[in-house]
Every structure is written in structure tokens, then in C-alpha cells.
From Swiss-Prot:
ATP binds at G12, P13, S14, G15, A16, G17, K18, S19. It catalyses: GMP + ATP = GDP + ADP. The keyword Nuclease does not apply. One of its GO terms (molecular function) is ATP binding. Belongs to the guanylate kinase family. It is found in: Cytoplasm. This is Guanylate kinase. It comes from Helicobacter pylori (strain HPAG1). The keyword Transmembrane does not apply. GO terms for cellular component: cytosol.
Length: 206
């Protein structure tokens, strides 16, 4: 069984800053693996297939579901999103910290697969700030943004199921917090075999 203490799940509303914080972690911690989501939505401006997402057709995605290729999948804003199994298991076997950027539905399912995973909810201070960010991003219509805000409020109702909360007001401060969380993953007490440690300690002291 691989060490699921090396899993870090980032969730929260679109526009809260998950992608920015994920990129920062990859820059600061060399031995990381970003779990690339597979989606049926169209690429936004500047997005590259295989770098930001694996973009596939709905037919291809459904075939993946039938073959059991996804750890989790969900329909969000009328598009399919999913997490592939093989790359995650390979990264864990190699001792890497695996980072997920997924929605709240995906978080719930992943925690069933990996109960020791650490989860962080990232949000703005309020919905007005989130709305401003989405408008500035310029990739969604006003109607889509309103749907995102409604969905964001629903996601906020799930806060209690997460280990940490980051209110992303000050980006530099948020970077410090997420880096601190990531660095402590492998040092959590639950990750250790207490019996083995105690025996080793006793033998060394004799």
C-alpha cells in the first residue's frame, strides 16, 4: 500500500487561486507530481493540452469511466472532470507529493480512496471579490459567472470536511501557508509506525 500521507488536495471555487498556489508548490518542492485532470470542456485561452488539463471528447471520457480509469469523476457546469488512477499510483510509489486541484465532489470521493490525504479549501473573503476576479479573468459569460457564484456558495457549505482553510486575500501570505502545510505532510504523527519507532528507540538506548 502506498503512502497516502503524501497526498495534498486543493479545492475551492473557480477563481480563488488554486492554480496559482499549485504552481508555486511545484516551484518550491522539487519532488511533487501534479495530478492533471481530464476534462471534456474546451481549453481556455493560453491552456495547453497535457500541461494544464487532458482535454478529451465526451465519448472518450465515458469510455474511460467504463474501463475504470478514473479515481473520481464528476459533472461540473455541464462538463466532465476526472482524475486518472495510474499516474497517481506511480507518483506515490516514487515517494512524491501528489497535488490535486479538484472540486468539492472530487475531494469527497478521493478521501474515500485515500483517507489520510490532507485537504485544503481555498476561498476569497467574500463572493464580491470572487466575482471581480472572474470578471477580470474574462473567460466566462456573465451567466456562467452567476452559476459559478451559486456553486461556490454550495461548496462553502462543505468546509467542515477539510483539514485547512486559506482565505486568499494576500497571495504572498497564502503562498507561505500552503508551503508550510505541504512541508509538514510526511511528518504527521499518523504517518509513522509507533511500535517500530519505539522498538528502535529502545534498542538504540541500550
Amino acid at each position: 500500500m502506498h503512502n497516502d500521507f503524501n497526498l495534498l488536495i486543493l479545492s475551492g471555487p473557480s477563481g480563488a487561486g488554486k492554480s496559482t498556489l499549485t504552481k508555486y508548490l511545484q516551484e518550491k518542492i522539487p519532488k511533487t507530481h501534479f495530478s492533471l485532470s481530464t476534462t471534456t470542456r474546451k481549453p481556455r485561452e493560453g491552456e495547453v493540452d497535457g500541461l494544464h488539463y487532458n482535454f478529451v471528447s465526451e465519448e472518450e471520457f465515458k469510455q474511460g469511466i467504463e474501463k475504470g480509469q478514473f479515481l473520481e469523476w464528476a459533472i461540473v457546469h455541464n462538463h466532465y472532470y476526472g482524475t486518472s488512477k495510474i499516474p497517481v499510483e506511480k507518483a506515490l510509489k516514487e515517494g512524491k507529493i501528489v497535488i490535486f486541484d479538484i472540486d468539492v465532489q472530487g475531494h469527497e470521493i478521493l478521501k474515500k480512496h485515500y483517507p489520510n490525504a490532507c485537504s485544503v479549501f481555498i476561498s476569497t473573503k467574500n463572493q464580491e471579490i470572487l466575482k471581480e476576479r472572474l470578471l477580470l479573468r474574462g473567460t466566462d459569460s456573465k451567466e456562467t459567472i452567476e452559476k459559478r457564484l451559486i456553486n461556490a456558495y454550495k461548496e462553502m457549505q462543505c468546509l467542515e470536511s477539510f483539514d485547512y482553510l486559506i482565505i486568499n486575500e494576500d497571495l504572498e501570505k497564502s503562498k507561505e501557508i500552503i508551503l508550510s502545510i505541504a512541508k509538514t505532510l510526511v511528518h504527521r504523527l499518523k504517518a509513522f509506525n509507533f511500535e517500530k519507532i519505539c522498538k528502535a528507540w529502545k534498542n538504540e538506548s541500550l
